[in-house]
């Protein structure tokens, strides 16, 4: 549970969202929620990188299809920062299985009804440890930036 501290988390806008033109809509939701994008790029994930990212699923039956899916098209990877960012982003993303995602969440609003739950629009780190590990997989330190936003002023002034 977050104690209202500033955190960073990794978000991946997955192939099903990229090919449907949802990148801007998804980024906009995070920014409107007061989260700050401190790193972002479009990349084509290699098979090797995908296998590192999803290493904890290596022995699961869906591992191969997960790697094939995430390497199918370019994706957008982002480092998102904010108070309790990991928890907030996970709530905004919605249930991992799109069939269970509530309307108003990213997956609830944008995931298509397909038999494969891996086509779920976004990836969001599930813990502080995962976020730190995943951010290091995709970003060098000099690719993550700090800059002021209006929210910083509100928190500093105690409004």
Swiss-Prot record:
Keywords: ATP-binding, Cytoplasm, Kinase, Magnesium, Metal-binding, Nucleotide metabolism, Nucleotide-binding, Phosphoprotein, Transferase. It comes from the Archaea. CDD domains: NDPk_I. Its EC number is 2.7.4.6. One of its GO terms (cellular component) is cytoplasm. One of its GO terms (biological process) is UTP biosynthetic process. The keyword Magnesium applies. It is found in: Cytoplasm. It catalyses: a 2'-deoxyribonucleoside 5'-diphosphate + ATP = a 2'-deoxyribonucleoside 5'-triphosphate + ADP; a ribonucleoside 5'-diphosphate + ATP = a ribonucleoside 5'-triphosphate + ADP. InterPro entries: NDK-like_dom, NDK-like_dom_sf, Nucleoside_diP_kinase, Nucleoside_diP_kinase_AS. It is an enzyme of class 2 (transferase). The active site is at 123 (pros-phosphohistidine intermediate). Its cofactor is Mg(2+). Its main location: cytoplasm. One of its GO terms (molecular function) is ATP binding. ATP binds at residues 14, 62, 90, 96, 107. Coiled coil: none annotated. The keyword Phosphoprotein applies. Major role in the synthesis of nucleoside triphosphates other than ATP. The ATP gamma phosphate is transferred to the NDP beta phosphate via a ping-pong mechanism, using a phosphorylated active-site intermediate. Belongs to the NDK family. PANTHER family: NUCLEOSIDE DIPHOSPHATE KINASE (PTHR11349). This is Nucleoside diphosphate kinase. It comes from Pyrococcus abyssi (strain GE5 / Orsay). The gene is ndk.
């Amino acid at each position: 549970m977050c104690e209202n501290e500033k955190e960073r988390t990794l978000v991946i806008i997955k192939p099903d969202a990229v090919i449907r033109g949802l990148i801007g809509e998804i980024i906009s939701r995070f920014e409107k929620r007061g989260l700050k994008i401190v790193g972002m790029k479009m990349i084509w994930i290699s098979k090797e990188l995908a296998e590192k990212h999803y290493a904890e699923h290596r022995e699961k039956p869906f591992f191969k299809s997960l790697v094939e899916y995430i390497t199918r098209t370019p994706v957008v990877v982002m480092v998102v920062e904010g108070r309790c960012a990991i928890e907030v982003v996970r709530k905004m993303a919605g249930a991992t299985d799109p069939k269970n995602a509530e309307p108003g969440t990213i997956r609830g609003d944008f995931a298509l009804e397909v038999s494969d739950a891996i086509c779920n629009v976004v990836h969001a780190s599930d813990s502080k440890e995962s976020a730190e590990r995943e951010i290091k997989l995709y970003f060098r330190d000099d690719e993550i930036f700090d800059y002021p936003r209006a929210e910083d002023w509100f928190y500093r002034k105690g409004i």
